[in-house]
Amino acid sequence: MSHLAISELLKGKVSVDSQVTVKGWIRTRRDSKAGISFLAVHDGSCFDPIQAVVPNSLNNYDEVTSLTAGCSVSVTGVLVQSAGQGQSYEIQANSVTVLGWVENPDSYPMAAKRHSIEYLREHAHLRPRTNMIGAVTRVRNCLAQAIHRFYHEQGFLWISTPIITASDCEGAGEMFRVSTLDMQNLPLTDKGEVDYSEDFFGKEAFLTVSGQLNGETYASAMSKIYTFGPTFRAENSNTSRHLAEFWMVEPELAFADLEDIAKLAEQMLKYVFKAVLEERRDDMEFFAQRVEKTAITRLEEFVEKDFAQVDYTEAVEILKACGKKFEYAVEWGVDLQSEHERYLAEEHFKAPVVIKNYPRDIKAFYMRQNEDGKTVAAMDIVAPGIGEIIGGSQREERLDILDARLDEMGLNKDDYSWYRDLRKYGTVPHSGFGLGFERLVAYVTGMGNVRDVIAFPRTKGSATY
């Protein structure tokens, strides 16, 4: 490449007095009476821009003094140690080439000032240019790379599971249909129902809600696998924690029980939090200053503390006895709400907590039934400051019990014939969990809404770009 990343220069990886070229966008321009302009140039490789000191002796100095926020430039000059506060290095420029101007700078949506989160959502195609979303993007990348690295080091294989599926993993029916049929002229059966045999796949097809079921097939042969990809839920949930399209990390581990995956989940979270604290300290300091003052300290505490563990039944007893008035009543057999989970993590245990062995009637068909006949080997990991961050279970490996559960939930066994085959041919105990990646990024950065930690959020009524 003919230019260097600004991050390389600011980390001191390039010798002082070297001739360097950087390319990026103008953050700010300041002109002095001494005939010198100071350009803050940013290329997205790190939080801070680098300052270019531009003398009026340049042939195109008039162009330089016309630069505004957002203009793209190529700057060549000598890298020197900076005498000014706030930066370690700067460039004494001997050439500035304007690559792209900003039309109508006064109306530039990302002018150099603070913008509200709501405003940035309305300009999602330009918001990566801001300090906040730029920092979110780098932290998100760091977390994703750390997740892949963790599983690689643990001997897991990354499996790419299908986006288009005919299976409903959760059995909830909140799925997006995929079809090439003419919506204005649908083919009908003799019963007046849509004839999906005429569709592209010859049957109903949907966007996946989870890669888990497909992942189990590979765990049943490769022992340790994980998926990391987009998932889709057609939930009518307009909250700060829900998206219609989001990314999931889903490991599946053969010859493993609930305790094994609870331990794996704890190891993974601590690994990726350490990575972001070490690799993206500059961005995390920004979040601690501008977004969530405990952004760094709570991750450090998370890494140091052992996770607490509690059975669902005991958790209900704790909540009932605590004397706190909740918006939603606490009863055995009812799923815990976010307020209940956060009380347990933030006030009772004051640590991340694994809640396990939930009532079978509120959990999915594939979760292993416990010996009491009332609960399943399921778990949620709840973190202070956000609530549930991971959900997982030991999978039901006994065919007769799985079949009974499918019947009980009104699910067609023929639709799951391939899944049932795994229990017919060398079945083994196996377990896995799902991590909502956007919730993880929101927790790490302190951003209050998952819509602000994914590039182009998809929510009910909103699919712009």
From Swiss-Prot:
PROSITE patterns assigned to the protein according to its UniProt record, in alphabetical order? AA_TRNA_LIGASE_II
Q: Where the protein is mainly located, per its record? A: cytoplasm
Query: Is Ligase there in the keyword field?
Result: yes
Where is this protein found?
A: Cytoplasm
Q: Which domain of life is it from?
A: Bacteria
Q: Which GO terms describe its cellular component?
A: cytoplasm
Q: Is Cytoplasm among the key words of this record? A: yes
- Gene Ontology biological process terms in this record: asparaginyl-tRNA aminoacylation
Q: Which reaction does it catalyse?
A: tRNA(Asn) + L-asparagine + ATP = L-asparaginyl-tRNA(Asn) + AMP + diphosphate + H(+)
Q: Which CDD domains does the annotation name?
A: AsxRS_core, EcAsnRS_like_N
- EC number(s) of the enzyme? 6.1.1.22
Which residue ranges traverse the bilayer?
none
Keyword annotations from UniProtKB, A to Z: Aminoacyl-tRNA synthetase, ATP-binding, Cytoplasm, Ligase, Nucleotide-binding, Protein biosynthesis
The main enzyme category here is ligase
Molecular function, one GO term: asparagine-tRNA ligase activity
The record's listing under InterPro entries reads:
Aa-tRNA-synt_II, aa-tRNA-synth_II, aa-tRNA-synth_II/BPL/LPL, Asn-tRNA-ligase, Asp/Asn-tRNA-synth_IIb, NA-bd_OB-fold, NA-bd_OB_tRNA
Q: Family assignment?
A: Belongs to the class-II aminoacyl-tRNA synthetase family.
> Which PANTHER family is this protein grouped with?
ASPARAGINE--TRNA LIGASE, MITOCHONDRIAL-RELATED, ASPARTYL/LYSYL-TRNA SYNTHETASE
- Spell out the subunit comment: Homodimer.
What name is this protein filed under? Asparagine--tRNA ligase
Organism field: Pseudoalteromonas translucida (strain TAC 125)
Which classification does the entry list for the species? Bacteria, Pseudomonadati, Pseudomonadota, Gammaproteobacteria, Alteromonadales
